[in-house]
Amino acid sequence: MLTMKPSPDNDASIAQLADLFHLLGDPTRLRIVLSCLAGPIPVGEIAGGLQLSSSLVSHHLRLLRAARIVKAERQGKQVFYSTADAHISGVLTDMLDHIAEPTNGIDP
């Protein structure tokens, strides 16, 4: 499958990226996605770890799933969530590494 690489001249790609960054710009959603980095995790465990209601976490997960940021896998009565693919995991891991780096004299 051949896909077009996003470029500054491709308005559709820019709009999609802006939507993704908008979704990830919400601190609650970002915490939820980061909870999914380590592997499949059920909604209740995400909610408990973040001290949020399961219904609120489920709402955010629906948005994140629609944007292909997370994926869901049903196992019996529970649904487990994880990051959608290596691209999403890589971007988040790289950004976490980036903010952990010393500034080396660069003004924030």
Identify the function of each model-found stretch:
Residues 12-55, 75, 79-87:
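N-terminal helix-turn-helix DNA-binding core of bacterial DNA-binding proteins
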